[in-house]
Amino acid sequence: MLLHQTADAIIRARENELRKIGISRMKAVVLFIVKAISGPATPAEIARWLFREPHTVSGILDRMERQGLIRKAKDLERKNMIRVVLTEKGEEAYHRSSEIKAIRNILSCLSQGEQDNLRAYLETLRKKALKELRVERSLPFP
């Protein structure tokens, strides 16, 4: 329960911060993933990173495309594949959303050593949870 309440409170603070720049948390996460993926970002790859079904991600990407944050481009080498590319507006939104002031402010109650330990503990827990889910890939952390 403590983990759930803490995560919810931090997420809500982050959503409030993102609302001020006109972007949802999920859209900010998608922008981060597109930037973090080495190689072309595809809807299927984004879905894997988000632990979402492809049709759910497709809806998010459609809304982001209508907002001008991303562009879906056909892959020139593989005609049946779509690549997701950030537009200039998407790049700007990515940079504005990557400031994460709310989370930094929340973490400021911990010393640098405590923050380092927390990060290490969270990475250990994430690794174990991914193993439990039989997911064999590393996920980035900003």
Write out the residue ranges for each language-model feature.
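A short acidic, leucine-rich amphipathic alpha-helix
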Residues: 45-47
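Short capping segments at the starts of secondary-structure elements
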Residues: 37-42
